[in-house]
Curated annotation (Swiss-Prot):
GO MF term (any one): serine-type carboxypeptidase activity
Signal peptide annotation: 1-17
Residue positions of the active site: 266, 458, 520
Function (record text): Vacuolar carboxypeptidase involved in degradation of small peptides. Digests preferentially peptides containing an aliphatic or hydrophobic residue in P1' position, as well as methionine, leucine or phenylalanine in P1 position of ester substrate.
One GO cellular component, as annotated: fungal-type vacuole
Catalytic activity: Release of a C-terminal amino acid with broad specificity
Cysteines engaged in disulfide bonds, as pairs: 179-419, 313-327, 337-360, 344-353, 382-389
Propeptide, residue positions: 18-124
Glycosylation: residue positions: 210, 509
Gene encoding the protein: CPYA
GO biological process, one term: proteolysis
UniProt lineage: Eukaryota, Fungi, Dikarya, Ascomycota, Pezizomycotina
Protein name: Carboxypeptidase Y homolog A
Length: 543
């Protein structure tokens, strides 16, 4: 789940936006000049010459008016670390790093690459009977510790219900940034949900039906994870993911022999290209990475932001949420937004990237947010903004905050929250939101297949934007992929065989799917469809 801008940041952005000049054509009709036209080129030159002054003014305004709200480090969570003696296993990264082997060329090398000496992995065997979550299925929970940086990432592993000795392993990451992957576990694709009476209800469409799944709370201070420091950009989090998987597969070599897939949604569109590239950068590793999956992700803002207006204004397959006047206003703001993003792409500096995010989110996202409709599903009103429009998150949070649950999982923090707005703010104010992480995707595609899937009722990371960036991505297979046609995606695996669940296009290692009737969280709205395409993808279909 991807946060919309918090109320504070939206207010700040609106204040800054009032200082911005809207690009308009000379005819005064309020239409933005088109790229490639002489009017556009002249206007762009004027804009670029004033950009530095505008950004300086933006930061001055922020410092003056919001100085009490801009600490760039989120507050640490209260915690009590359990002694190592209370854990079933403790894996030392230093022990792994110290192992040398002789290669085929006769030269000595480390058995496993990477800086691991500062990491430990603590493991607890979870008793399913105590929690009632997937009874009979082997489970582990625990923490990855970065002892140098005082970072502690919580994970919960579920073995496959089917054939764990042969089924693949999947890592699941929620987005935000700042949202717990236990949201995905209990609201979307995990082995159980929680009802309003705090009872555990089995999920027949869990992704661990035919795969073992790891749910990871990252970055630090998300969910049950904690730290005395912080992580405020995607690249910094990548090293932790590599360490977690390396130590986990070292402790459980029976899973290391299986195919491994990294998956996630929303802001994981930032995470996964970075994390996959980090794993693939290591030649000697025990991580058998075979593919990456991103659902309703934010990956290439420059290509995706132009699709917010069409999605909100009735061009995405659902009725318009916004009126024509608001839609025109979004059009008028778009060129300035895109110019800011382009400058961010060129510099990758927070000095530029933060104003880009603030202006674009104010001009392009805020009009939708102000309607009271659910930004994660254009078909519904937002029931409760405090719970990100999904009141069931409150029930899940209450269940996870029970002392008996926390004790059974070995949790070391005092409380759980589904999303940490401080983390979201940290990433935003370090410029991470608008950075061009899609540039890593071509190198990933050289080595593994990538699936981009999108529920077609989502606004915040909509299918139009995801289709647009996948079609536009420059990679050796670009031309064939862009020319490929969307074909019907139908169920083949069960009693509903032949039911149309979406559309798919694929070429080379790249696949795009549109899933019908699903919002931001595809497994929540279309559980049967999500398990269908997952199982087929893991079996190697489309790649």
């Amino acid at each position: 789940m991807k946060f919309l801008t918090t109320g504070l940041l939206a207010t700040a952005a609106l204040a800054a936006a009032q200082e911005q000049q809207v690009l308009q054509a000379e005819d005064g009709m309020g239409q933005a000049p088109q790229r490639g036209s002489s009017i556009f080129d002249e206007t762009l030159q004027k804009f670029q010459s004033s950009l530095e002054d505008g950004i300086s003014h933006f930061w001055s305004e922020m410092k003056t008016n919001f100085k009490d709200y801009l600490p760039l480090i989120s507050l640490p969570k209260k915690h009590t670390r359990r002694p190592d003696s209370e854990w079933d296993h403790v894996v030392r990264g230093a022990d792994i790093e110290s192992v040398w082997v002789q290669g085929a060329d006769g030269e000595k090398r480390r058995e496993i690459d990477g800086k691991l000496h500062n990491y430990d992995l603590r493991v607890k065997a979870v008793d399913p009977s105590k929690l009632g979550v997937d009874a009979g299925v082997k489970q582990y929970s625990g923490y990855l510790d970065d002892n140098d940086a005082d970072k502690h990432l919580f994970y919960w592993f579920f073995e496959s219900r089917n054939d764990p000795k042969n089924d693949p392993v999947v890592l699941w990451l929620n987005g935000g940034p700042g949202c717990s992957s236990l949201t995905g576990l209990f609201l979307e694709l995990g082995p159980a949900t929680i009802d309003k009476n705090l009872k555990v209800v089995s999920n027949p469409y869990s992704w661990n039906s035919n795969a073992s799944v790891i749910f990871l709370d990252q970055p630090v201070n998300v969910g049950f994870s904690y730290s005395g420091s912080s992580v405020s950009d995607t690249v910094a989090a990548g090293k932790d993911i590599y360490a977690l998987l390396t130590l986990f597969f070292k402790q459980f070599p029976e899973y290391a022999t299986q195919d491994f897939h990294i998956s996630g949604e929303s802001y994981a569109g930032h995470y996964i290209p970075v994390f996959a590239a980090e794993i693939l950068s290591h030649k000697n590793t025990n991580i058998n990475l075979k593919s990456a999956l991103i659902g309703n992700g934010l990956t290439d803002p420059l290509t995706q932001y132009p699709q917010y207006r069409p999605m909100a204004c009735g061009e995405g397959g659902y009725p318009a949420v916004l009126d024509q006047g608001t839609c025109r206003s979004m059009d008028n703001s778009l060129e300035r937004c895109l110019s800011l993003i382009e400058t961010c792409y060129s510099s990758e500096s927070a000095w530029i990237c933060v104003p880009a995010a603030m202006y674009c989110n104010s001009a392009i996202l805020a009009p939708y947010q102000q309607t009271g409709m659910n930004p994660y599903d254009v078909r519904n009103k937002c029931e409760d903004m405090a719970s990100l429009c999904y009141p069931q998150l409150n029930v899940i949070t209450e269940w996870l905050n029970q002392k008996s649950v926390m004790q059974a999982l070995g949790v070391e923090v005092e409380s759980y929250e589904s999303c940490n707005s401080g983390i979201n703010r940290d990433f935003l104010f370090h410029g991470d939101w608008m950075k061009p992480y899609h540039r890593l995707v071509p190198s990933v595609l050289e080595k593994i297949p990538v699936l981009i899937y999108a529920g077609d009722a989502d606004f915040i990371c909509n299918w139009l934007g995801n289709q647009a960036w996948t079609d536009a991505l420059e990679w050796p297979g670009h031309k064939k992929f862009a020319e490929a046609k969307l074909e019907d995606l139908k169920i083949v695996d069960n009693k509903n065989k032949g039911k149309k669940i979406g559309q798919v296009k694929s070429s080379g290692n790249f696949t795009f799917m549109r899933i019908f009737g699903a919002g931001h969280m595809v497994p929540l709205n279309q559980p049967e469809a999500s398990l269908e395409f997952l199982n087929r993808w893991l079996r190697g279909e489309w790649h």
